[in-house]
């Protein structure tokens, strides 16, 4: 038996609630588009239009084709736009609209945002300038690092509470929501904007192509004939407050954050543990924190990338955490078959659509 070392607090509801949501994805420019599209089984994975796909194993992706035009600005060089930040601002503006202006003091309003690749486009532009014998615009240096996403969004809304950047690969958006709930439980903020954002880039596609992870057809998670993943882009954002704060100010609660868990496989740089050990520990931690038993789970929106190694490992993790009996009774699916794998935004988008 594997030894267990888990310091997760074992108590009931965290007392944290979602009062605002925003999203932009291949299914449309709002959280409502994401929700309705997922309910109807719409597939937003189609031929990518905004970049060359030559030499790749796929021509498809969950591309945002709606205009990405946030009303709030951010600091950037003339003639260059960092798409991941603009996607985040569009989703954040929708989520923040749920709160009356001035309800939360800027010093008590936090930001926790996750991303895998925000800044790649800025880095690519820097390298292009160097290659072409130009002097790169110093402003690009402010956008290259992952924290630029959280910093830019926080500044756009003039928020002066804790501003944190999460860069934990494909779990970034989900971890951001969990860490935001921790800030609220600890009394370090009265409201937190949390979520994730990532945009398409040729570097990202090339990386997954090198891993031989891309499917030539739209991804089919958990299917016996799955061929790999479909990349997606976009952003998902939620506004979290303590449940008591929501009641006191008459805010509509969309959902509660009952609990979350963090763990690592420590197994391989690109492959999950085949038995799903790390993922199972995260699920078990989330259940302990929330006080929820396996028999109370009505549905699992899984990671479900559609790769040959991920889906069996994740299935094993669910079985380990819930037990064979309850795992067999619990419906599991993945929205990545509709919006693609949004990387650092994936966990936030999954939370919204669930």
Predicted regions and their residues:
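Condensing-enzyme catalytic core mediating Claisen C-C bond formation in acyl metabolism
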Residues: 15-19, 42-47, 57, 218-290, ...
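N-terminal amphipathic, basic-rich helices that act as targeting or association modules
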Residues: 2-21, 80-105
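ACP-dependent fatty acid/polyketide chain-elongation machinery
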Residues: 1-77, 244-256, 352-354
């Amino acid at each position: 038996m594997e030894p267990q070392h888990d310091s997760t607090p074992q108590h009931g509801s965290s007392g944290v609630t979602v009062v605002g949501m925003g999203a932009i994805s291949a299914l449309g420019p709002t959280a409502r588009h994401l929700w309705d599209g997922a309910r109807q089984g719409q597939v937003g994975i189609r031929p990518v239009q905004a970049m060359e796909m030559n030499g790749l194993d796929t021509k498809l992706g969950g591309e945002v084709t709606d205009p990405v035009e946030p009303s709030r600005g951010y600091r950037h060089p003339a003639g260059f736009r960092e798409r991941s930040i603009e996607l985040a601002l569009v989703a954040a503006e929708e989520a923040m609209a749920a709160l009356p202006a001035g309800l939360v003091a800027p010093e008590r309003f936090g930001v926790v945002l996750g991303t895998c690749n925000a800044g790649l486009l800025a880095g690519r532009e820097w390298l292009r300038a160097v290659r072409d014998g130009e002097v790169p615009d110093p402003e690009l240096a402010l956008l290259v690092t992952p924290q630029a996403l959280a910093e830019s969004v926080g500044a756009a809304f003039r928020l002066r509470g804790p501003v944190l950047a999460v860069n934990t690969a494909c779990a970034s958006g989900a971890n951001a929501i969990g860490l935001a709930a921790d800030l609220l439980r600890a009394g370090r903020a009265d409201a937190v904007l949390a979520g994730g954002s990532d945009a398409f880039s040729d570097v990202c596609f090339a990386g997954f192509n090198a891993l031989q992870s891309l499917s030539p057809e739209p991804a089919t998670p958990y299917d016996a004939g799955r061929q790999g993943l479909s990349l997606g882009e976009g952003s998902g954002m939620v506004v979290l407050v303590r449940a008591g704060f929501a009641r006191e100010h008459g805010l509509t609660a969309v959902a509660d954050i009952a609990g979350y868990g963090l763990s690592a496989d420590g197994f391989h740089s690109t492959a999950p543990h085949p038995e799903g050990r790390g993922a199972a520990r995260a699920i078990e931690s989330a259940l302990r924190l929330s006080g929820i038993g396996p028999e109370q789970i009505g549905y699992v929106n899984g990671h479900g990338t559609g790769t040959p190694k991920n889906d069996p490992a994740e299935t094993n993790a669910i079985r380990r955490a819930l037990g064979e009996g309850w795992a067999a009774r619990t419906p599991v699916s993945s929205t990545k078959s509709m919006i693609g794998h949004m990387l650092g935004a994936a966990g936030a988008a999954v939370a919204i659509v669930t």
